[in-house]
């Protein structure tokens, strides 16, 4: 069978299903892929058990089960992630193994919002999932229209509580199971849901269109030419002649001009996100720049030392700690290319954190580093990873 050609003319977005256990996330995922395949003949119709039997993957030493499903609407191509267990969601969202441009929150109309509904909304907020669309599932089991309205209001209030625009979020009522069984009325609801997703979740800005940033991996000097910083361009583009800022691990940011861009020993006019390059920097001494700093477009990213984060602590089985840790614990925080020591403060009422738990915490680093909300990091102890986290708010 010939491989289907990937249609680049359509925009692409990464989404996922979130919500409480047994509210119908996987059934909905199967229903979306099936209904869209039936409508356009494109993509693959996935059955529930194909999605539910997701293989385990290891992402930075953390074991996660995730199902990856792809499908397309008339205007967009989607990569959709669905996780079998609650712990998999927590790990997935915190490590960024599954980056989501938006999420479909599945709430059973028969049960209303439950503890994990709340937890997934909070996680979405903390890890920076920007948009949520709601699917009220199992509506075929609820006869009372008023009850449906009540559940919808509850979900909207819950979203508002975590700073999502609860009043404006699209809410679609349906039944994933009925749609999967081929009931035309409920298939229509799936199309209505995807129309809402198409419209409400904006096409993400591509990495190449964002402002330039490159973490410095290595530095060396070329006699007669100057200092070269090497690394992989994380986002944006850099051209010969561009002014860049060197950020982190120093009192003041310094500016310099890129006088040459090299890749695979060849000279380039410019480099973009994904390229592994060497950037020749004007007037920068070998000791003025080091691994762990970043080069960035001036004024686009700032150095910080204190932030709030959402963290997953590896279990003993994943190679993590065997014992809990407490406030004032001082591990290394590995940002992009380097370790920086930091002190942890746990939230009020949290005595300690056990291996396998996830928690919010405040971190204070001993030196500043270029960070933003959404920056990912690992927590390490003597070179082994004991946790994975994401910056949720910067405090100073």
UniProtKB/Swiss-Prot annotation:
GO terms for MF: GTP binding; GTPase activity; translation elongation factor activity
InterPro entries registered for this protein in UniProt: EF-Tu_GTP-bd, EF-Tu_GTPase, EFTu-like_2, EFTU_2, G_TR_CS, P-loop_NTPase, Small_GTP-bd, T_Tr_GTP-bd_dom
Keyword annotations from UniProtKB, A to Z: Cytoplasm, Elongation factor, GTP-binding, Hydrolase, Magnesium, Metal-binding, Nucleotide-binding, Protein biosynthesis
GO CC annotation terms, alphabetical: cytosol
Domain tr-type G, residue spans: 10-205
A Pfam family matched in the record: GTP_EFTU_D2
Main location as per UniProt: cytoplasm
Region feature G5, mapped onto this chain: 175-177
Ligand binding (GTP): 19-26, 82-86, 137-140
Description of how the protein assembles with itself and partners: Monomer.
Protein name in UniProt: Elongation factor Tu
Organism placement in taxonomy: Bacteria, Bacillati, Bacillota, Bacilli, Bacillales
